[in-house]
């Protein structure tokens, strides 16, 4: 790649991709937390519980990923400016493209546990291979045509979404088709929250325009608080129960309410 795009651009992309790897690691850990519950439900033949766990778990993981990646996307310019330098900040769109795929693929990859439990991995392997071959072939053609790095990244993002989200959900739909309407609704709501967090974070950076670490931290905290304030629009009681499995939010709320009641008794 470096012969076509240049060593400088390739180095910038490598640094940006490294930042994306941090976000993928965080969201990946969150997604794994639901897998033992899915395995237990499947082993006991509780398929309704299995479907509910995977659908709710995918949504919670998607929301958390949307929160993290939406903020990073909205603050992509100051992040690159402070982390690397002002010149690199002009490549903020590359970071946006890298972050864009994470919530979608994190949401979709949660469903991959289902066909693994059913030992139906052949379809996934064959389709993944087909997508990879098409992607590599397309990339080679684009590089020979001399297209810019942005177009190359967009093609890669499309391939990643196809393999990491569309493929997993499509195979899942053949196993538990009755739950697909809820899956589509959850995916739409997750994308809506993702877009909202990105827009709000971008607006915060527009007004503050961070240029150093302190102002960047201020922007990050403000973006996080605003994103958490709008989160209840996308979360209901069922989602709170699913979230409480990995983060004891309801337990903490009950503890705070108990202490407040005791102090005011």
Placement of each model-derived feature along the sequence:
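Transmembrane helix-bundle signature of multi-pass secondary active exporters and lipid flippases
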Residues: 13-32, 64-68, 98-105, 160-163
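Membrane-interface helix-loop junctions in multi-pass transport and translocation proteins
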Residues: 121-125, 129-165, 169, 173, ...
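Interfacial/gating helices of multi-pass transporter permease domains
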Residues: 3-21, 89-93
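Interfacial transmembrane-helix starts/ends
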Residues: 14, 46-75, 92-95, 184, ...
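Membrane-interface junctions at transmembrane-helix termini in multi-pass inner-membrane proteins
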Residues: 99-131
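Interfacial segments at transmembrane-helix termini and the short loops linking adjacent helices
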Residues: 7, 55, 72-103, 176
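Helix-loop junctions and terminal segments of transmembrane helices
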Residues: 16, 21-58, 112-117
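Membrane-proximal transmembrane or re-entrant/amphipathic helices at the cytosolic face
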Residues: 178, 201-265
């Amino acid at each position: 790649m470096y012969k076509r795009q240049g060593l400088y651009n390739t180095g910038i992309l490598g640094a940006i991709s490294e930042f994306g790897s941090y976000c993928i690691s965080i969201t990946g850990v969150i997604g794994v937390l639901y897998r033992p519950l899915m395995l237990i439900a499947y082993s006991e033949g509780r398929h309704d519980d299995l479907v509910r766990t995977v659908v709710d778990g995918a949504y919670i993981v998607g929301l958390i990923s949307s929160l993290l990646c939406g903020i990073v996307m909205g603050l992509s310019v100051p992040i690159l400016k402070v982390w690397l330098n002002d010149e690199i900040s002009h490549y903020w769109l590359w970071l946006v493209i890298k972050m864009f795929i994470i919530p979608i693929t994190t949401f979709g990859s949660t469903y991959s546990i289902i066909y693994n439990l059913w030992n139906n991995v052949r379809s996934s392997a064959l389709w993944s291979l087909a997508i990879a071959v098409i992607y590599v072939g397309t990339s080679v053609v684009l590089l020979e045509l001399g297209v810019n790095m942005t177009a190359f990244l967009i093609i890669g993002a499309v391939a990643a979404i196809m393999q990491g989200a569309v493929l997993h959900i499509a195979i899942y739909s053949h196993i538990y088709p009755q739950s697909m309407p809820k899956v589509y609704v959850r995916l739409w709501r997750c994308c809506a929250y993702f877009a909202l967090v990105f827009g709000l974070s971008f607006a915060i950076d527009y007004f503050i325009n961070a240029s150093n670490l302190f102002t960047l931290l201020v922007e990050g905290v403000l973006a996080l608080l605003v994103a958490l304030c709008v989160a209840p629009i996308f979360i209901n009681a069922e989602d709170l129960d699913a979230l409480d499995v990995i983060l004891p939010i309801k337990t903490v709320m009950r503890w705070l309410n108990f202490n407040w009641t005791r102090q005011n008794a």
